[in-house]
Amino acid sequence: MELAHSLLLNEEAYNQLGEVQKAEFIFEWLRYLEKLLLATSRNDVREKQKTLVEQLLSLLNSSPGPPTRKLLAKNLAILYSIGDTFSVHEAIDKCNDLIRSKDDSPSYLPTKLAAVVCLGSLYKKLGRILGNTFTDTVGNILKAMKSAESQGRYEIMLSLQNILNGLGAAAAPCHRDVYKAARSCLTDRSMAVRCAAAKNEAIFMWSTDLDSVATLCFKSFEGSNYDVRISVSKLLGIILAKAVISKHPGTAASRQSIRRVSLEEVLELLGTGFLRGSSGFLRASGDMLKGTSSVSRDVRVGVTQAYVVFVSTLGGAWLEKNFAAFFSHILSLASPSHPKATQTQIDAVCCRRCVSFILRTTIGGLLGEKAQLAAVKDICQAIWKLKKVMDAVMSDGNLETRLGSTDVAASQHMLVCALQELGNLIHNLGTTAAPLLQDSSTGLLDSILSVILHPSISVRLAAAWCLHCIAVALPSYLTPLLDRCLERLTGHKSSPEAVTGFSFAVAALLGAVKHCPLGIPHGKGKIIMTLAEDLLCSAAQNSRLSAQRTQAGWLLISALMTLGPAVVSHHLARVLLLWKCVFPASPKDLETEKSRGDSFTWQVTLEGRAGALCAIKSFVSHCGDLLTEEVTQRLLPPLPCAVDLLTQLSSILKMYGSPLKTPSVVYRQRLYELLILLPPETYEGNLCAILRELAADLTAPDIQVAASTFLLPPLCHQDDLLILSPFLQETDHRFIEEQLLLGNGVACGSLEYDPYSIYEKDVEGDSVPKPLPPALSVISSASKLFGVVCAHVGETQRLLILEQLLDSIKHTKGARQQVVQLHVVSSVSSFLKYVAGSKGCLGPEEMKRFALTLVMGALESPNPLLRCAAAESWARLAQVVDDGAFTAGLAQVSFDKLKSARDVVTRTGHSLALGSLHRYLGGISSSQHLNSCIGILYTLAQDSTSPDVQTWALHSLSLIIDSAGPLYYVHVEPTLSLIIMLLLNVPPTHAEVHQSLGRCLNALITTLGPELQGNSTSISTLRTSCLLGCAVMQDNPDCLVQAQAISCLQQLHMFAPRHVNLSSLVSCLCVNLCSPYLLLRRAVLACLRQLVQREAAEVSEHAVMLAKDSREELTPDANIREVGLEGALLILLDKETDERLCHDIKETLNYMLTSMAVEKLSLWLKLCKDVLAASADFTAVTCVDTMQEEEGDKGDDASVLTTRRDEKSHPFTNPRWATRVFAAECVCRIINQCENANSAHFDIALAQEMKKRDSRNDFLVLHLADLIRMAFMAATDHSDQLRLSGLEMLLVVIRRFATVPEPEFPGHVILEQYQANVGAALRPAFTSETPPDVTAKACQVCSAWIASGVVSDLNDLRRVHQLLVSSLTKIQAGKEALSHLYNESASTMEILAVLKAWAEVYIIAVQRHKNHRQPLKTTTCLEDGIRNGSCSSDGLLDLVYADLGTLSRLWLAALQDFALLTLPSEFASQLPAEGGAFYTAETSENAKLHYYNSWALILHATALWLTSTGFVVADPDEGASNLSRPVTPTSMCQGSSSGATIKSPEDVYTDRFHLILGISVEFLCSLRSDATMESITACLHALQALLDVPWPRSKIGSDQDLGIELLNVLHRVILTRESPSIQLASLEVVRQIICAAQEHVKEKRRSAEVDDGAAEKETLPEFGEGKDTGGLVPGKSLVFATLELCVCILVRQLPELNPKLTGSPGVKATKPQILLEDGSRLVSAALVILSELPAVCSPEGSISILPTILYLTIGVLRETAVKLPGGQLSSTVAASLQALKGILSSPMARAEKSRTAWTDLLRSALTTILDCWDPVDETHQELDEVSLLTAITVFILSTSPEVTTIPCLQKRCIDKFKATLEIKDPVVQIKTYQLLHSIFQYPNPAVSYPYIYSLASCIMEKLQEIDKRKPENTAELEIFQEGIKVLETLVTVAEEHHRAQLVACLLPILISFLLDENSLGSATSIMRNLHDFALQNLMQIGPQYSSVFKSLVASSPALKARLEAAIKGNQESVKVKIPTSKYTKSPGKNSSIQLKTSFL
């Protein structure tokens, strides 16, 4: 293929190829040429032009296929447009000659068609350059058209379209001729030709003769397919729209005599088409007289689409202006003045569907939310008008006149359409519609409620559905509406209309409850149940109302079931009783019944029993949890009787006639539906009877063939439906298109066919339910049930039934036979499907034969859907039999049929059967079998005489490729060649063949998979072919083929991304982003979603580049140039209604945001801001809110919330609330993304600095004003969902930016300036009408804002605090005083949210207060703090303190509730019957979730409060409370006023203590996987707070089992949670437990001493663990549990401590390591705990644990003793030394009973430390000598002398000191001197003297050495100074007779460092410091040891002179004065010295 990449065709390479390859080669060359020509210079093109033209024209004769001729024409046109146009006329003449040719052979046809295409392309590109040649050309083409076949007509139409496009107005002379040709083509038998003609006419058609154009279009709709309806409706709609808006007489259009047509005329024209179709007036009138309808459904559907195109073309603004006229016209289509449109119910339902579609698509799709609100008002007006008309008629006294009035009957359809659209509109508007319902002038609810009494059942149902929509959109109206309807129903029980109407309304409203998370009050269920019972009981009292009351009663019960188990469980007994009573008790009673009664009573009876069946079905569907064994047993008894009645129905029907026909069908349907849901075992005894009835239903058809077709789609495989009618495919017009599936005389689904469906959720999203007529529904249920029942009866019975079914097919004829066959096949299919699914078996051989005969017959049925279902059953049959030979036999049957049969039906059926076999049974093992299959399908795929056969064969081939897997590899190349050959040759008019080819190509790409990345020649060729195939499909005019192309490219991109041209793929995706075809849009989004996961930035760039290149193909809807691909997707999301597509758009945007939000921050924030601001009507809100602020804050508010002044055209016009919610969620995601990026996003100073450095830098903090503004706009919107999102955004902003400082105002944070805005955003959420979920969210934001510390000024803080206070006042009355609009659990949610918010504020206040109590350095600091507001911590606590008394009681009540709710189910019977303080017993399940979300912080706050009281406030009433309402008392916190038994304070404390401890332990014990970190941390902090106080500690200390249990729980937490913060918090609790145990032991010892009077005794009594044996029992020992826990922590951080891991019993020498900060903190905390343990033990016990503790402590020291710069100790070393000191100082080391053992163990420990450190061994070089030396020092100083003074240890210690003194490292030397300093000072001479004897001389030598060479740096200076300090200490501790000698050594060294006056000036800083140090020391030593001093100075004149000079030189700078008095005490000879010192 590379050889095809040249400017001229490489003929040499071309001629060497075979026929198929030649076509491929040419196509590849032409593809390349198109790109090359556009990139080549004009001169280069002209050089080669002549040859190139010849090559291109010669290709015309080579029979090019459709894609090739299109490319050829395109290249020819490009070539002439770039090069010279001299020879263009020759080219045109040549083409015309080819067209004129008389050769009509099929082989010459491609040449003629290529010539036609070339002409079109040339004229399109060159236009007027070609002069007047077009008249001849057009004439020639039109002449050719007369004899052309369909393909020719198709290409001619497209070519004429191009010619007219290129010539523009110049082509006017030809318009008439072209119009004539197009007119005939619009009604062509080929659908493709009709489409082409419509596209052609759209170019030049104007409103010259609108009537004839319209009539022509109406004719074109007759017998049309989906594509024709789309094209022709587009033509008609656009022409009519142009006619309405053509108002510029100066334009070129006016020269074509355009007349402006009024809107009324246009609408009348469309209305005529809708009502009369394409027939003329006379024919239509004749039809009316005959009472027949001449308008076929396809015409009506076509006109419906034209209406939509017409309005869409004119746009939303036009519709808004002309809404009233348009709406009344559309409604009139279903009006009484056009009875023909609605003369039968079937017609009426279809007509209503069309009207609803027009309204939904225009009002719902084009209008923004404001315009929709106005539309709602108009619709209400229309409803009122229609209501008045009805009232006028109904007021007529004559009942007959009333009921017979055509007005009432016909206006019903207008009302139904109006009500349904009203419901849809409000449903979509959501809570945005709230102002409308509050507007009394509109009277919206009244208008709907008024028509609930309409005589027509359809209207009553539509009104009920409309109420359902209002309730879903506005949950706050659900309960009031329910109350109103129940009240009316109770009050109007004697009106049949009221009973049915209001029962429908109540049922619809109950159906809405599942869509409203806040629910309805639980008590409503009881009211409804009572009313339903009352209706059922009173039904018999009044025969006029019997049927209505019966239906209403059961309808209410059925709807009640949708409320779920929580509600139904309370009424189940009554329901089961009614269920039992509705059926006779025995068959005998049933017989008696039959003989009594009349037609009417049976009608009522059947209605009642059908209703009861429906109620039980609803129960089984919605309350599965209640279906226990016991309930099932109570359900079953009436079933046999219900089945008995089923078998008797036919005889009852004969007896009482046709009035019972519908009730009996409904009864059957209800029973079948119930049985499908129940397990077959429950009706085992009736299986045979049921089966017989099913067989009778299925074989006694009274419906048409077309109607039965609806059964088949669910039985076909989803993929197979693609090869069938487009009606089965999802399109934007499916709502109206699906009518055509059933044929003209068949009813579509509609609500009035089954009122019981009003409370069920519609399968297709949220539109009104559309149940089919009972006659169809019963067949559907029967066929499903047949599958189940047939699988459970005995084999004999099964055989008999199948035989009976087969016979019934044989014995019927004609259309009737088709219906029976259809029913039977669908039933057998569901049977096979059921058996295959349940892994059952088919039965005897005979069964196989019957099944085979049945399916075989259907495989050859003329109905394609039936063939499809049969192919599926064929494969299922093989799957069920599961026998290789049988499967092979089936395949062989199909082979034989395909070889012999020539008819399309057999060939399509059996080819699909082969594919289905492979799908269910894989590759059917044998490759020979696979070869045969592929061979046959190849042959069929090339049968160009039948596109159907090709389509089915190729589809089957795609299934085989998919299922064969690797087995297919050998066939890949030939299959790919076949696909490419067919793609290049099959005419584009056969789109279905191309679609199947696309599926094959897709399957092949999947089969090749990642191998497509390979570089071998064969793979490269395959890849090129795949790409070429995709290119052909991308150019196909059919949208589904284009979708397949995109899907194939998506697969290719997944497996071989480098080889797919991303730029062209993205370009293709952008062009089709707003395609009118749903499936194409879905394919585009699915592909985009995949691309952006890998290459979001590249995709986005390509899209923008494409938009900048301003290609004309880009749809104006996708405004990529202005808003980028991201913005285009947001716009699309706003307009899109398909749920799957919306999901994909959101996913795509999320992926793009994740990878690009940080880089394109401004773009993303602008998009979100534009979406949120586009329809934010927040000017008013701002005014209202700021009015409530103080004057000074207005400026702040305005700074962020100014309204947009620039009302420029906005990329987002009126986005819907759902889009705005998504934008708000995006903002939160953007903030999260920035959090993981650069820290500058949350540091304004750094951000500004980096922005200055490079202006392209962008940081989130710079957009804070926008973030606040967006959050404000969202939080104050009308839409509740948006308010929730806005509050969440505000919460995220507060949490992320609370600590960002404001650089311009030190001590302040950046958020402080927005406090007015935050207040204004929060305030609306606390109004009385706000829903609880919004208030709950706002409470969370309030507490976050107060806790964030942003606001320091208490007055500012009070505003938000006041909101929480108001909430607290509201909730004080507990569950009694809260809203009755929602379920009680909603009140629980709100109460707990308020309490949680207060808890958070209190926790923060206490923490700040604690931090603030840390002593402040100076008073000035304190004053500054107050001035800066940082000292508001006490103030905040004061704010909370005012309400703390109330809060504490409420918190305790909430915790008690939570404790009750978390009890295991076995305690359910003991729970209080009325519920808890804040929940009711009935709603406890729903309430649990809210408690789970809130309990942790409430627990922490309660614990803090109890801590603050020290457990000494017995009654919370004593706490300050400023609230007057009484708090709900609970047993937990009853005051003396409660009237209950008064508890002692001790009991109250104990209860509270156990409540908090119990909740904590229960939670920590069984941590759920979804337990949040916040909850665990809060729980641990609560325990910490609890144990901060003596009283709870004493409880824990005295109850050892409790302590152990708690430790075990904490151990588990540490094991299961890796978070360091949680583990640290757990360790802190452990430490407190040990403290509690210590205190307990101390207390026992103290009291024992006091009791025994033994205070003077030396021995301590035996208290503590270990008693007098020292044994610690695992599970019973607190110490053991603590050790386990600490070992766990230590070994996790330092695995080397585990002897099992290291394989060594002792502390093994390994390289030390530094732990991370978290690890260090954990290890340190564990060591602190270990060091406390001996104090909890008895002396014997301490001996047991000491080895372990020492091993671990020394182990940590050894493992982490790393050398750090500057001689620092690592935190773990410091902790281990501290712990060591604690252990060594333990009283147990000195206790009489343990002293000896401790001494031995401590000596061993010291030996271990000494052994760790051996300078000879190389591996120890890493160890820090200072750490080990410090450890030795701790031993020396902290233990009793007998530990360290034994000679061997003492000698080793001294050696270590000597060794370190020799180390050159100055840091080590300094530390050694410091340690020796402390040892030398040790008061016990036995310890210190050996060290002094051994080391003093050594130190002296060192100092003299320094003295000789003088220090050169600070380190040496420090060493010297420390050395001197050690010598000074020696002097101090030395005995008197040695002291003079030591001073004599010390003084010369000090004096030698003194400088005289001259030297001091020039000395280095080190020498100067040394001088100062020496002088200072001399000044101190002189007076202390004056005699030695004097004698030394006297004996050495040099020293004396030096000292005098130094003092003299220093007299200015040194301020240290030696007191004269000391020297004057002993005057002597040394007067000069005295003089000097005196002088000083």
Swiss-Prot record:
PANTHER family: HEAT REPEAT-CONTAINING PROTEIN 5A, HYPOTHETICAL HEAT DOMAIN-CONTAINING. Transmembrane segments: none annotated. GO terms for cellular component: cytosol; endocytic vesicle. Pfam families: HEAT_HEATR5A, Laa1_Sip1_HTR5. The keyword Amino-acid biosynthesis does not apply. HEAT repeats lie at residues 846-883, 1079-1116. Residues 1646-1668 are annotated as: Disordered. The modification Phosphothreonine is found at residue 1115. GO terms for biological process: endocytosis; protein localization; retrograde transport, endosome to Golgi. Keywords: Phosphoprotein, Repeat. This is HEAT repeat-containing protein 5A. The gene is HEATR5A. The modification Phosphoserine is found at residues 1110, 1647. Belongs to the HEATR5 family.
